[in-house]
Curated annotation (Swiss-Prot):
Belongs to the bacterial ribosomal protein bL17 family. Pfam families: Ribosomal_L17. PANTHER family: LARGE RIBOSOMAL SUBUNIT PROTEIN BL17M (PTHR14413:SF16), RIBOSOMAL PROTEIN L17 (PTHR14413). GO terms for cellular component: cytosolic large ribosomal subunit. This is Large ribosomal subunit protein bL17. Keywords: Ribonucleoprotein, Ribosomal protein. The gene is rplQ. InterPro entries: Ribosomal_bL17 (IPR000456), Ribosomal_bL17_CS (IPR047859), Ribosomal_bL17_sf (IPR036373). The keyword NADP does not apply. Part of the 50S ribosomal subunit. Contacts protein L32. One of its GO terms (molecular function) is structural constituent of ribosome. The keyword Ribonucleoprotein applies. One of its GO terms (biological process) is translation. It comes from the Bacteria.
């Protein structure tokens, strides 16, 4: 039974899903705007927002924890150096999802995922 199991499988194995969201998180933090399918966008919010909350308190332990989840030293630096100070006063809701129609070919619902207050 799947009682109380949160998260969406998205038709992938656990390792594939973990790697995909790791890559999507790095892309989101690098470009601050990405386009993806709506279910992936909604699940990405559950992965990326806690990292920004974690980065608001800068410590070696938090940097190591963020690195263990992102595996990209440059993006960890940007997360703690640029993004966390930007959202210091905001108590959550760092990511905005904007629907942008359906994809040609398979008619999948698409969405833009962007960081709020980006320049």
């Amino acid at each position: 039974m799947r009682h109380r199991k949160s998260g969406v499988k998205l038709g992938r194995t656990g390792s594939h899903r973990k790697a995909m969201f790791q890559n999507m998180t790095n892309s989101l933090f690098e470009h601050e705007l990405i386009k993806t399918t709506l279910p992936k966008a909604k699940e990405l919010r559950r992965v990326a927002e806690p990292l920004i909350t974690l980065a608001k308190e800068d410590s070696v332990a938090n940097r190591r924890l963020a690195f263990s989840r992102m595996r990209n030293k440059n993006m960890v630096g940007k997360l703690f150096g640029t993004l966390a100070p930007r959202y210091q006063a905001r108590p959550g809701g760092y990511i905005r999802i904007i629907k942008c129609g359906n994809r040609d070919g398979d008619n999948a619902p698409m969405a833009y995922v962007e960081l709020v207050d980006r320049d």
